[in-house]
A protein has these predicted regions:
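Gly/Ser/Thr/Pro-rich low-complexity, intrinsically disordered segments
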Residues: 2-7, 16-19, 23-553
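Nucleotide/phosphate-binding catalytic cleft detector across ATP-hydrolyzing
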Residues: 13
Length: 553
């Protein structure tokens, strides 16, 4: 077994401001036990108060691959548990949902009613850090009580419920309020894997496991491949009502094969495994079906690949989708008239139901036309499913014996198709965090601002601290994969603004947010090294980023 070299660098409790956030990476000094210098990320994180203690443990996993474990800050006696009230909507729409936030007048009205019921409620103004296209004044929240433990808030929640409101108990350390984040004391726990393409002789890649429709844990995916290191990857379908669980909810390419369409033009991590290099790119989808040799005549739109027709997780597909054609995170858009392609990678059987399913061989020649959906995809071939008005359109071009031309492409920002080869992998993400070394957090563009919800989704997903997974590239061309634990009193997590700050502190010049929350996981040599936030432990995920000790080609 490969020997592991390790050392700990304990940083001073306070440093002059000029040394807190150097622009580029630094090199950790080797100890006597380790004569070979191992490159580590930059010396300190721009996270919380400037005087926080920070400890780093750097482990060399292989030549050109390091793991850096970072702890920053410590227990903060000013933090506590509190009850947060779901404020009923002031909209005339009787179906309008309650929200964590409201305008000041309505929040004060709710607080007054609670105080009349014996609840010591308070109103707090929520100011969020300004991002490239979102943030600022989010509204007002209503909270009650200060508790030493979550369980201590039970009686207050009961009083709030009796007064006719819903509430939950949460930890104030998870707030991302702009007035307090730069004075936060932590604690934070992060893991960083750095891959240097100039030294690493293995392969950076991604994998969904045995098939797309059955998610697996990050450590399972790492173990199957013998990965040195792995993190969870992109967003994916969790709920069967939103599609096939495990299906990437955004662009995905595995070993050069395009197996999921993009969400609008959200950013993705594009990996060249042959060179062990990666880049952050905005990609859009283009799909079409026509008869071979028709030169564009009778061309049909192909709406996607390897997902349930009619269900578009995170939206951002086309103008016919409801409620929007734009990206809308954690929302499932619908379209009753779609055509979707399926590959053998999808799973044991394609989605069943009414519609049409066309079976193609390895040369895309039609071998069967079925009047219902749901079959096994032939080895080396694929199928096309149509629903709604797509049925007659597909039937018109796909007769048995006809050879079709099927295009499935991801288009880059230059308007040209992404060139793929067997070493190409793409993992979806969002929002964008950094561009050219500058923070450029495009939360609204990438679908994290929900219309007409009183900023409630933004408040919980962007503004508040959560577990996060980050991927990016530094000025030296190294790829960095980062996890930050959260939803714990011993690890607060990061707001999206703090996520970008951390990426920049680590020397990244281009970076994006990957799937986080309960999905955030890092495994080293098959063993989980962070603390996933789900009560059940590791969450099965759609795909994972893998650092393999040897090349597959």
């Amino acid at each position: 077994m490969r020997s592991i070299r390790q050392w700990v660098a304990v940083l001073a409790l306070a440093l002059p401001a000029a040394f807190l956030a150097p622009a580029g990476p630094s090199t950790a000094a080797p100890t006597a036990a380790n004569a070979d210098a191992v490159t580590s990320p930059t010396a300190r994180l721009h996270l919380g108060a400037a005087d926080l203690p920070e400890t780093r443990t750097v482990t060399q996993l292989a030549p050109g691959v390091t793991q850096t474990s970072i702890t920053r800050g410590g227990p903060d006696s000013s933090l506590f548990w509190t009850a947060e009230v779901a404020i009923p909507s002031s909209s005339p729409d009787p179906d309008a949902p309650a929200s964590a936030l409201s305008d000041q007048t309505h929040a004060q009205f709710v607080a007054a009613r609670l105080r009349a019921a014996g609840v010591q409620a308070r109103v707090e103004h929520v100011q969020s850090p300004q991002l490239a296209d979102a943030g600022g004044d989010l509204g007002y929240r209503v909270r009650a009580g200060q508790f030493g433990t979550k369980a201590d808030g039970t009686d207050t929640v009961s009083l709030i419920t009796a007064a006719g409101y819903s509430s939950s108990v949460l930890y104030t350390g998870w707030d991302g309020d702009s007035a307090s984040t730069d004075q936060s004391r932590g604690p934070w726990k992060l893991e960083v894997v750095t891959i240097d393409p100039k030294q690493f002789s293995g392969e950076l890649t991604s994998s969904f496991g045995a098939d797309i429709e059955n998610p697996e844990t990050t450590s399972q995916l790492a173990g199957q491949s013998g990965a040195l290191a792995a993190t969870n990857g992109g967003f994916f379908v969790l709920d069967p009502k939103a599609g096939a669980p495990g299906d990437p909810a955004g662009a995905a390419v595995y070993q050069g094969r395009v197996l999921s369409e993009a969400v609008g033009d959200r950013p993705s991590l594009v990996i060249d495994g042959k060179k062990n290099q990666s880049s952050v790119q905005r990609l859009t989808w283009y799909g079409s079906i026509s008869r071979q040799g028709d030169q564009g005549q009778n061309q049909l739109a192909l709406n996607g690949t390897d997902r349930v027709p009619g269900l578009i997780r995170n939206c951002g597909n086309d103008a016919d989708d409801t409620p929007t054609a734009l990206p809308l995170h954690d929302v499932t858009c619908t379209d009753a008239n779609e055509t979707v392609a399926f590959t053998p990678e999808f799973g044991s059987s394609t989605p069943s139901g009414p519609g049409l399913e066309v079976v193609l061989d390895s040369k895309d020649t039609v071998t069967a036309v079925n009047s219902v959906r749901g079959i096994s995809v032939p080895k080396g071939g694929r199928t096309l499913q149509a629903i709604g008005s797509g049925v007659d359109k597909l039937r018109a071009v796909a007769q048995v014996g006809t050879t079709l031309k099927i295009t499935t492409e991801l288009i880059n920002e230059q308007g040209t198709p992404l060139k793929t080869k067997p070493s190409t992998n793409v993992v979806n993400g969002g929002p964008l965090l950094l561009s050219g070394g500058v923070e450029n957090i495009t939360a609204k563009r990438d679908g994290m601002v929900h219309p007409n919800d009183g900023n409630s989704f933004y408040y919980g997903w962007v503004h508040k601290r959560n577990p996060r997974t980050i991927a990016g590239v530094d000025a030296q061309g190294r790829t960095l994969l980062v996890t930050a634990d959260g939803r714990q009193t011993t690890a607060l997590g990061l707001s999206i603004k703090e996520t970008a700050d951390v990426a920049q502190s680590l020397g990244m010049v281009d970076a994006l947010n990957l799937d986080g929350g309960g999905s955030t996981t890092m495994a080293i040599n098959g063993q989980v090294v962070n603390t996933p936030s789900d009560a059940t432990g590791q969450r099965p995920v759609g795909d994972a980023l893998l650092v393999l000790p040897r090349r597959k080609d």
